[in-house]
């Protein structure tokens, strides 16, 4: 489900991986209200399974989760040739590790509490950059 194959927000899929039920609900409902297709996972293990099954266009990822943490999810996403190109937005209350998340391969970091509209705007910006990069690569 590459962003370059999808012309509108109505066909873009986001996977929200967060163990906080309230955060998952708030982010998911807002993103749905903007026309995005939203899938949810309450922990990293479930998130990894859904990433491989669904191939979302964007992943929203919390770091501190049970079973498999966000760091492990991010590492797995970046190491797989199938998922390495999926943009990952880390949304976490662990603000002192922001720089480390970029070194680990995230595309954007937002500190909790993060307004859902900011998450949406960040997702849109990442998808625009990805689409532009694909257009530039195709024109070479």
Regions found by a protein language model. Give the residues of each.
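Charged docking surfaces used in two-component/phosphorelay signaling
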Residues: 25-33
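Short hydrophobic/Thr-rich beta-strand motif most characteristic of the beta2 strand and flanking loop
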Residues: 35-42, 50
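Active-site beta3 strand of CheY-like receiver
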Residues: 54-60
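Receiver (REC) domain active-site loop signature in two-component systems and cognate sites
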Residues: 65
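Hydrophobic/aromatic residues positioned on beta-strands within the core alpha/beta folds
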Residues: 89-91
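C-terminal output helix
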Residues: 114-125
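The C-terminal output helix
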Residues: 124-140
